[in-house]
Amino acid sequence: MKQIKLKEPKNGSELVLETLLELGIDTVFGYPGGAVLPLYDAIYNFKGIRHILGRHEQGCLHEAEGYAKSTGKLGVAIVTSGPGATNAITGIADAMSDSVPLLVFTGQVARAGIGKDAFQEADIVGITMPITKYNYQVRETADIPRIITEAVHIATTGRPGPVVIDLPKDVSALETDFIYSPEVNLPSYQPTLVPNDMQIKKILKQLSKAKKPVLLAGGGISYAEASKELNEFAERYQIPVVTSLLGQGTIATSHPLFLGMGGMHGSFAANIAMTETDFMISIGCRFDDRLTGNPKTFAKNAKVAHIDIDPAEIGKIISADIPVVGDAKKALQMLLAEPTVHNNTEKWIEKVTKDKNRVRSYDKKERVVQPQAVIERIGELTNGDAIVVTDVGQHQMWAAQYYPYQNERQLVTSGGLGTMGFGVPAAIGAKIANPEKEVILFVGDGGYQMTNQEMAILNIYKVPIKVIMLNNHSLGMVRQWQEAFYDGRTSESVFDTLPDFQLMAQAYGVKSYKFDDPETIVQDLEVLKEDIPMFIEVDISRKEHVLPMVPAGKSNHEMLGVKFHA
């Protein structure tokens, strides 16, 4: 077993940093406090790891998420004990929902004070048990390198997810020898990566019989970096592709086989195809309720093959006729390696293409700036190549529907948990991880006010993201549901008074603009070409709805607001 032993003893905090460095980690996001002072003292003179100081622990977690989601690398965050750790809970839960590889260090009171209601003590191991892939509390300083190495392995392998390491203050201050081994010995944790060969053959056998096959591409395609294989498989067998929200970008929106995003705010063609298919091949998708609608009627006439790296997801919501446990990339490679089977989807492709082309995207209006048009214009200005980050709400769905995605990991959003406040810090994390890429953030006036303090980072760390606020002076998605299902009673969803967002941005040293003229908006958005941190507020109508929409509990074919060409 390979080991590295340094001559001089190190304290626990130095062990943390040395181990992270050995594991190739060079960036962490954090916020100091009493229980992590030894760790921050070690950071002061440590070379090789960059620390980004957030402005709130939730922001630090979302920054780490944006870093991880946009790259596939591990995101790392450090917070203190008690309120610092509890402030991080939302980010940890968000990462768990979306399978984001995170390593979160939480400070803890000294071992002698644990369980005695010490100042700033919280049982973070107990609190995070349901929302982490695994968690640790370090009891001995010498265990730090092993625990971190295991934690990184767990967070980044199999189905990725967050791992918490609770670090008592005295453990981080005591000295010991630094003995590091890159090897991990976890007999009880052995994720299945290679699918069963017989199950792969069953998929192809069923495909040869299918007249109306559909590929459903989820976020697992991005995590496995399997977009190339997905496209090759779809093209070989001429299978139309539907994506989940997190699967956006796994196939280019311009690809003739792409039908759109499926589900509650999915496209007409995608939802009808999922309803009428006779064979669905789902890859890296967990069939959440926003995608399936009524699970009893979802793909009701179809045989279903479900490929997922997490066996717990298979059969949990939609029964699988052909269950396949394994890595999405490996599964697709095995499907492609098999002899090509004969299938004929010509009539099916003709039908779904007709469905795709018969729908109008949205009604063009002259008197108001339309959010759809803003997103389309930004797609043109960025050549469809920007990393798009969103907060949560109507703007999130419009960004999913109207930006021309081309690549995996191009859309960074909060899918499973739907966390308002995700946007600003996640965009910061994405830009720090991808300094050469354009990062565009779409955010609403509601979500922006939850974490806008992170805007302080933009000039301090030279992070030139472009913040596009689509301001409808309300909690737009809440208001939309109230108008649709609560007889228009917009209870507490309309903001009668707002801060001056221009002055707020300027207070953080960020150049700001406000646009509200539909006649000039196309030219106005040219300012995005400037490579500086930028805040653009675009006034849009309060009346705009995200369409189509499948009401909660209804089947996917029961869409509201579909508009057809005359």
Predicted region positions:
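Phosphate/pyrophosphate-binding active-site segments
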Residues: 2-7, 142, 301-394, 503, ...
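N-terminal alpha/beta PP-like core and its mobile active-site loop of ThDP/TPP-dependent enzymes
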Residues: 2-341, 377, 381-384, 464-467, ...
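Active-site diphosphate/adenylate-binding microenvironment
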Residues: 13-17, 21-26, 39-43, 353-430, ...
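Active-site nucleophile and cofactor-binding loops and adjacent substrate-binding regions
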Residues: 31-33, 52-62, 77-84, 139-140, ...
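A general structural motif
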Residues: 57, 116-117, 190-202, 262-266, ...
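Well-ordered beta-strand positions enriched in small/hydrophobic/aromatic, beta-favoring residues
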Residues: 75-77, 165, 388, 411, ...
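Thiamine diphosphate
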Residues: 119-120, 314-317, 323-325, 329-333, ...
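Generic enzyme active-site microenvironment
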Residues: 164, 306, 389, 442-443
